[in-house]
């Protein structure tokens, strides 16, 4: 590995980690303008009719925070349009986009043999968390006591380290209704 490729890798990671903060409204508007010139129907009727530019910016930032590619702006807008009649909450709309892109996202993390290395929750814990789901300011969250929350955080951290030390991206595979709350 030469020093140029190491530098390139570090710069790429740096940009990825700060991408949500770098994505401002002007950039989002320019992206939408480019899409509108190619595919007007993708944008018209969605922004600002269904959601505002700043709400869409929040959705894109949420996706970038989780390293979800936002290249398919037309597809993202379609998912947002299909779900904006139910909610305008950026976290929930970003989650709908993630779920729609599940196949694409999983392909990003498969190894050379096509295997996806993940860890999962114990069925009893999954059940307990499912029954503790409740609404929060960020959309949805778990309403569990502090000791259980800390135990979950500790065990999750351990499992993430195991995967990372094995050279894999640490991924938790859980039911979609738990994912957003677990992420937050």
What do the predicted segments below correspond to?
Residues 1-184:
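Membrane-embedded alpha-helical signal segments
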